[in-house]
Amino acid sequence: MDYIWDTPSDIAVRLADRLRKIRKRKKITQKQLAGRSNVSYATLRKFEKTGQISLESFIKLTMELDLVGEINDLFTTPVYTNIEEVINEQR
C-alpha cells in the first residue's frame, strides 16, 4: 500500500480505527479502556471518531492494550532510500 498521498489526518484516522478494532476484539468498552488507561472517556471517544489525540494519551491507550511493543518498534530499523544515507549514518 502506498501512502504518499495520505494526509496526517488520514493516518491518524487509520490508527484510531485500528485501535478501536483491537479494543473491540479484546471486548473492552470505551469507558473501561478510558478508566484503565487514565485517559478521559471524552478523549477516547474523540480519538476513535476523529483520530485526534495527544501523543501521551495515545501511548497510554497502547500500553493498556499491550501494544507498546509495536510503538517501541517504530523507527528502530533504518530504512535507507539511497547509498548516501547509509554513508552519512556511518559518520
Listing of model-derived features with the role each one plays in the protein:
Residues D17-L33, R91:
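Short basic helix-loop element that most often maps to the first helix and adjoining turn
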